[in-house]
Amino acid sequence: MDPQNKSPKPQVKSTRLVVKKQPAGVVFPKLSIPVNDFEKTVTLTRAQKKEAKLLKKAQRKANKLNNKQDSTFFNSASGETNNTILPPGVKNQADNKTNRFSKFISFFTSSKNKQPDEITERLVDDPTVKNRFSAFNKKLIWVLKDKKLRARAWKIVGYTNLVIVAFFAGLLAVMNKFITLSSVEYPAIALQLPINNALWGISIFVISIVTLPFWTMFILFLMGVKDVRTSRSIHYFIWIVLIINVVLLLVSCLLMIAAYAHLDGYNIWRNLESLNPNN
């Protein structure tokens, strides 16, 4: 066969497939190029296959992001929300579950016990504290942080409780004697028997609850709880009991004034002489 009669083989120009990365969230068509006026699929090289895998991986990540809500989180330190850049098609909506959980955790986490160096540091308003605590709570936090203010608060509590205990201990002794007096010899006291019984019961109640916070502190100390004196819960308990006792002290004074204001000095002295055990 004559070699000159051989038909020459068609020369195919070498084409190079260039795959460009597309942004996430875009569906890519099949990769194909025309060869010799025919539509044929091109066999990819190793580098091109690796690049195609990376594109598919990016596509899967974009699909996952499309099924999720906006990835925002609650910053407990500053109280602000940080938004991330989302792929197209994803709505910018707040993650309510994450925000609720973060607020729940940040509400119960206590702030660091930092000793204020200056008065101005205690007067700076913290936006997170402003939203969560009232003015009384913020004042109590400042008092517990400052050693001088904390010592002054303990002195006020101690002296007030001593006055309350002394008042109601004397009132209990007097009322315990008054409720046993004869109505014939002491008619003025016998006429006020309901008030005397009420004052007697109030005295017992106040004396029984005035030491309850301190017993609680002692039990917590034995259980190994540290810094019981600086606990906000303990101070709430102490001040609530103290306010109740002060209110009952005022009520007792009003009851005694209403019961014995009509008596003159001689009758009051005569009634008080009944406390003498020699009589």
Curated annotation (Swiss-Prot):
Principal subcellular localisation of the protein: membrane
Q: Which residues cross the membrane?
A: 156-176, 202-222, 237-257
Q: Which GO terms describe its cellular component?
A: plasma membrane
Task: Identify this protein by name.
Answer: Uncharacterized protein MG144
Which keywords are on file for this protein? Cell membrane, Membrane, Transmembrane, Transmembrane helix
Q: Where is this region: Disordered?
A: 60-92
The signal peptide, as residue positions, is none
Q: Which organism is it from?
A: Mycoplasma genitalium (strain ATCC 33530 / DSM 19775 / NCTC 10195 / G37) (Mycoplasmoides genitalium)
* Biased segments, Polar residues type: 70-85
Topology class, membrane: Multi-pass membrane protein
Q: Where in the cell is it found?
A: Cell membrane
